[in-house]
Amino acid sequence: MKIKVGILGASGYAGNELVRILLNHPKVEISYLGSSSSVGQNYQDLYPNTPLNLCFENKNLDELELDLLFLATPHEFSAKLLNENLLKKMKIIDLSADFRLKNPKDYELWYKFTHPNQELLQNAVYGLCELYKEEIKKASLVANPGCYTTCSILSLYPLFKEKIIDFSSVIIDAKSGVSGAGRSAKVENLFCEVNENIKAYNLALHRHTPEIEEHLSYAAKKKITLQFTPHLVSMQRGILISAYANLKEDLQEQDIRDIYTKYYQNNKFIRLLPPQSLPQTRWVKSSNFADINFSVDQRTKRVIVLGAIDNLIKGAAGQAVQNMNLMFDFDEDEGLKFFANL
């Protein structure tokens, strides 16, 4: 028997990837597409490549008969929308940032709004599947992690958990394709602005910073403050992070490989690459995999960690479906058994 799901925000890039994945999921029926601006428009008119003959509607959510609702909506939307009564009717996976951070003051500092739903904020489960699998299985509200956050945390988590690095020395240099900025029209995302160009942005201000720090703090069992610098590169999709940290001990690469293997050997979507094989965005494009590898610089006594994901799949829609699979006791990789098409 298939579960019935709905999507609010299916017209965006992440929403479209959700539709694409769910149409090929054997245990899911897409029953509702919600929109306030495209009511009556058929989804195929918006995305002719997508075989979904369903029109956008704008119903009161309490009227819907769904097992699960995905929210691929702008920040602040779901924080005002969700309530306990709705969560008694259906499960929710929120792809926005509205329930990712536990400290309400972080929303005032980083997102510039006062969170209106602090009780639900505390009850939401952070949907990083490789770290919080058991909590996700029991959750009614899952906060899907950010794209930079997913790649950064997965790449560094074992080092923080084992406390083998100087936490104050950590620097994350991140690069993302243009789809990470969303589908809405912006001058800075026009072809002539981004083509043949790389630029840094939001220096010391990127909103994924507190998310990364919060969950690496849980791993380290102490408050973490780190440096995160994102860059926009002229490609459609993909994230590559390069992270640097000082080692506290004289460790060899095999020592660190043993640590990563201990944490990730049973995870279906994390690929610890062989020695000397460095992650590339094209190897994870349109897939739910996270590729990770590292090198130890014996001269500087630093570990250099590289991670790559597709920002729209493992960084958004694919991870949301992975969360759904856990919440409904499906195989974790159901509907996600695809790999990069080079």
Swiss-Prot record:
Which PROSITE patterns does its entry note?
ARGC
**Listed pathway(s):** Amino-acid biosynthesis; L-arginine biosynthesis; N(2)-acetyl-L-ornithine from L-glutamate: step 3/4
Q: Where is the active site?
A: 147
Family annotation (InterPro entries): AGPR_AS, AGPR_type-1, NAD(P)-bd_dom_sf, NAGSA_dehydrogenase, Semialdehyde_DH_NAD-bd
Q: Which GO terms describe its cellular component?
A: cytoplasm
List the catalytic activities from the record: N-acetyl-L-glutamate 5-semialdehyde + phosphate + NADP(+) = N-acetyl-L-glutamyl 5-phosphate + NADPH + H(+)
Which keywords describe this protein according to UniProt? Answer: Amino-acid biosynthesis, Arginine biosynthesis, Cytoplasm, NADP, Oxidoreductase
Annotated compartments: Cytoplasm
Query: What's a single GO MF annotation on this record?
Result: NAD binding
Per UniProt, the enzyme's principal EC class comes to oxidoreductase
Q: Which GO terms describe its biological process?
A: L-arginine biosynthetic process
Q: What is its EC number?
A: 1.2.1.38
Q: Which family does it belong to?
A: Belongs to the NAGSA dehydrogenase family. Type 1 subfamily.
Protein's job: Catalyzes the NADPH-dependent reduction of N-acetyl-5-glutamyl phosphate to yield N-acetyl-L-glutamate 5-semialdehyde.
Recorded protein name is: N-acetyl-gamma-glutamyl-phosphate reductase
Record organism: Campylobacter jejuni (strain RM1221)
- Highest lineage ranks of the organism? Bacteria, Pseudomonadati, Campylobacterota, Epsilonproteobacteria, Campylobacterales
